Amino acid sequence: MGWLGSGVLLWSVAHLLKRVAPTWRSRMGGAGRPLVALSIIGSVVLMTLGYQQVDGPVWWVRQSGLVGINNLLVLVGFYIIASSLTGAHITRFVRHPQLTAIKLWAVAHLLVNGDLASLILFGGLLIWAVLAVVLINRQDERPVREQRPIVWVREMGAFSAAIVIYGLVGYAHGMLGYPVHG
């Protein structure tokens, strides 16, 4: 459990550093970017290795009815992330699209995984994403969203990217022994 918890903590600190210690982070200047990047890479390694090693209690098991909801939430999360990159219309209504996608992803995984490792990983990242949104909202003014027409190329690009990413991630899950469809 130590590696997994350390990975989630390192991820959170690396991402929140700018918000909780802005003066210290700004003093680091450009030299701090590689350190933050290495911290994030290290956190992913720790979370991946740690998740596989945690052996603990299971509070609930996967219910077949929730698998479809899980998959839909993950797909919507991928769409929101892709939309943030393509400028699709939904981003006019979602202030923090990437953090919103992480929250959807975490909740989706908590619906179908009630083991200790999942609670630490997905619960920890959910807490981080909620905290990040709160800190950003306190520090930054709400941006004025410009009225713009829907550009269907962007919409289809985001939708297509979400489907492709969902398929690739689903395939990788299966290869790693975590099937997404039951």
Predicted regions: what is each one?
Residues 1-95, 100-182:
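Membrane-anchoring alpha-helices and their flanking helix-loop junctions
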